[in-house]
Amino acid sequence: MSNGIVAKRYAVALFKIAKEKHVLEMFEEELRLVQNVYVKNGELHSFLTQPNISKEQKKTFLANVFGSVSESILNTLYILIDNKRIDILPEIADEYVVLANEERNVADATVYSTRLLSEEEKLNIAEAFAKRTGKDAIRVKNVVDEDLLGGIKVRIGNRIYDGSLQGKLARIQRELMKNR
């Protein structure tokens, strides 16, 4: 079974627990925290995937590092250790965020721009794209892309809205080539 399918199953289980306990937001924050530490800390990843370190040592280590997270998240980490699936932790977190966003009718957007956007600009973009996508809210993450000449690109899910200068020039070029 592919890692994506397995990750989705874990995410769905966590989502059901979170929904039952009314802690969707808290679980999301905790999963993002755990995911961030796991992805950015190569030593942690190496330790948790080392076959010569016992499962109990790994669990004790996880309890020390992530002792502040909820019992459900910590138990999920333990199960991942037991099933030798800790490597799919980032995918589980991503899948959980998708499920939680769907439940709240929220979307995450990555906005690529030539400079950091002000809070007001982010708010304006969020409002405009919330209307356009039919979502209640859009959470904006701004990424500076120095390759852009001007304008912005917005990525929501697997959809890209290209309002960049390069995008406009490419559309003009296609139109000119079509009219030849």
Swiss-Prot record:
Q: Which GO terms describe its cellular component?
A: plasma membrane; proton-transporting ATP synthase complex
Molecular function GO terms recorded = proton-transporting ATP synthase activity, rotational mechanism
Is Transport among this UniProt entry's keywords? yes
The record's listing under InterPro entries reads: ATP_synth_OSCP/delta_N_sf, ATPase_OSCP/d_CS, ATPase_OSCP/dsu
Membrane topology, as annotated, equals: Peripheral membrane protein
Q: List locations, semicolon-separated.
A: Cell membrane
Question: What superkingdom does the record give?
Answer: Bacteria
Q: Tell me which UniProt keywords the record has, alphabetically.
A: ATP synthesis, Cell membrane, CF(1), Hydrogen ion transport, Ion transport, Membrane, Transport
Biological process annotations from GO = proton motive force-driven ATP synthesis
Recorded hits in Gene3D superfamilies, A to Z, give:
N-terminal domain of the delta subunit of the F1F0-ATP synthase
Pfam families linked: OSCP
Q: Which SUPFAM superfamilies match?
A: N-terminal domain of the delta subunit of the F1F0-ATP synthase
Q: What is its main location?
A: membrane
Quaternary structure and interacting proteins, as annotated: F-type ATPases have 2 components, F(1) - the catalytic core - and F(0) - the membrane proton channel. F(1) has five subunits: alpha(3), beta(3), gamma(1), delta(1), epsilon(1). F(0) has three main subunits: a(1), b(2) and c(10-14). The alpha and beta chains form an alternating ring which encloses part of the gamma chain. F(1) is attached to F(0) by a central stalk formed by the gamma and epsilon chains, while a peripheral stalk is formed by the delta and b chains.
Q: Which HAMAP family match?
A: ATP_synth_delta_bact (MF_01416)
Q: Which NCBIfam families match?
A: ATP_synt_delta, PRK05758.2-2, PRK05758.2-4
Q: Which family does it belong to?
A: Belongs to the ATPase delta chain family.
Provide the function of this protein. Answer: F(1)F(0) ATP synthase produces ATP from ADP in the presence of a proton or sodium gradient. F-type ATPases consist of two structural domains, F(1) containing the extramembraneous catalytic core and F(0) containing the membrane proton channel, linked together by a central stalk and a peripheral stalk. During catalysis, ATP synthesis in the catalytic domain of F(1) is coupled via a rotary mechanism of the central stalk subunits to proton translocation.
**Per its record, how is this protein called by name?**
ATP synthase subunit delta
